[in-house]
Amino acid sequence: MRIIDSIPHESMTISIFQMNDKYQVRFEAGPMEQTFKFTLEEVKSLENLKTKINAEFIEATRKRFNEMFVQMRDI
């Protein structure tokens, strides 16, 4: 697996990896991580993948991180 691109964001690290016939988009915020997997067949190209990872997708991921932080804090 190798990193092929990243998406700039002020509060998360967003990295795009490629391995065999899949892309993985990894979001990292503090001790939390979320990874989304896409096949090349689904997205066709890196450019198409990056259009799927739009502001709405990123915001939903950020909200999920907030839920994860609360859950971890309350353990």
Q: Positions of the model-derived regions?
A:
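A mid-sequence interfacial segment
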Residues: 9, 40-43
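N-terminal acidic leader/helix
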Residues: 1-34
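Short amphipathic beta-strand/extended segments with alternating polar/hydrophobic composition
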Residues: 33-41
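Mixed-charge, Lys/Arg-enriched low-complexity segments
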Residues: 42-75
